[in-house]
Amino acid sequence: MLSPPGLMLQQTEALAQKIRLGRIEGCQYGEFIRDNVFGVVNNTFPFFVERVGHQALVQLVEDFLLQHCAMEPEFHHIATEFVQFIQHGTWVNQLDLMVLEYEWIAFSAEIDQARINIESCSDIVYQNPEQYTLSCNPTLHLVELPFEVSSHSIQITDSAPSNYYAVFRNAQHHVVSQKLRPIDVALIQTLQPSYCSSLQTFQQQTEAQLADFDVRLWIQHFTHLGLLNINTLGE
């Protein structure tokens, strides 16, 4: 509605003010909004929540509602706007912010609407590599982190950020955080962001630059994980 009636604007503003003023009597909707935001943050950013603690999170949600002009009510928009709110303030330390941003990347890969179409990497493919293309999973994000990631926890490392991960959603709709070596990052970056290489060309170029590197085994490994896609030329 581009031009809502004046009375509607007044009523909406009054409700928003009640919500922002806190948990006051007579504003059950405000309680609902706070609980909803709190639930979104808890479910989307569990590592971050564990690090900051319950009381600090309650205050962060309160500050978010009081100070951030959120425009979209959907679950994923609340999560994104909460991250933006934290990024533009001094609410948490740098390490906690990086944990939050990593979890947002994983969440972004989960809800990405891109279609994952994985063709098996069989011997037939390698018999005719000129007939196939090689590309990255469209939900892929490459990140460098000061911690190591497992499915249930993160482990802070003492050194400067040097843990490389590929975060993506596979064909089984699972979000994967795959640890990478520097050589993996370099090769994957040649296929990003949306570049689609001939399988034959990629093999030849890689073999020319890395004489002792088994590029075929490397491709098989990452197509099996779902990080790389092999498709018939023309698809």
Predicted regions and their residues:
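N-terminal, charged low-complexity regulatory/assembly segments
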Residues: 1-114
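Short, hydrophobic/aromatic alpha-helical segments in well-folded domains
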Residues: 44-47, 186-187, 218
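A local structural micro-motif
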Residues: 57, 211, 230-231
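Hydrophobic packing positions characteristic
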Residues: 66-186
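Short amphipathic alpha-helical interface segments
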Residues: 169, 173, 179-208
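Short amphipathic alpha-helical interaction segments
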Residues: 209-221
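A short, conserved structural fragment
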Residues: 223-234
